[in-house]
């Protein structure tokens, strides 16, 4: 069965949103991304130095150089921001850059008390995403 490689074959921008904990646990994926050089790939890492979504355990995210790691595995552009003005400027710059691009957004630990939770299961999300990709392949 032929697999669709959405970043390599698609002209649309692909945005991957990660936390620093996930990036650290799956760092090998950055090397694969760098080696494949997808021009439409933007990797946004929210770095708060913690596994916030699963209890707030500390990570080394704020102690290591994630942009330097991205450069060393051949990301074409890297950015770090820590405030809204910097984010707005970088987002306009990213639109003109070829990927892979890393955007590290340094954020505070914690979340809003009124933050909603997902209403669909992971399997439902997977099936909806697969259906979306199949629809796009037919067009």
Give the ranges of each region predicted by the language model.
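Short, small-residue-biased leader/transition segments that mark boundaries at the very start
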Residues: 1-8
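Short active-site-adjacent structural elements
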Residues: 52-54, 89-90, 110-116
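Glycine/aspartate-rich loop-and-adjacent alpha/beta segment that forms the canonical ThDP
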Residues: 97-139
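Conserved thiamine diphosphate
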Residues: 13-93
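Short, structured coil segments at secondary-structure junctions
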Residues: 10, 37, 73-74
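Generic beta-sheet signal
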Residues: 12-16, 41, 97-105
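Short secondary-structure boundary segments
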Residues: 45, 82, 105-107
């Amino acid at each position: 069965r032929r697999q669709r490689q959405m970043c390599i074959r698609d002209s649309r921008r692909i945005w991957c949103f990660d936390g620093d904990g996930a990036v650290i646990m799956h760092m090998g994926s950055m090397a694969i991304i760098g080696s494949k050089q997808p021009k439409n790939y933007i990797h946004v890492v929210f770095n708060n130095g913690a596994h916030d979504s699963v209890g707030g355990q500390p990570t080394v995210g704020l102690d290591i150089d994630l942009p330097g790691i991205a450069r060393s595995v051949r990301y074409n552009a890297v950015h770090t921001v820590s405030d809204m003005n910097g984010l707005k400027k970088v987002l306009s710059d990213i639109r003109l850059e070829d990927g892979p691009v890393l955007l590290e957004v340094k954020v505070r630990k914690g979340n809003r008390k009124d933050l909603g939770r997902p209403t669909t299961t992971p399997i439902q999300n997977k099936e909806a995403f697969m259906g979306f990709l199949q629809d796009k392949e037919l067009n």
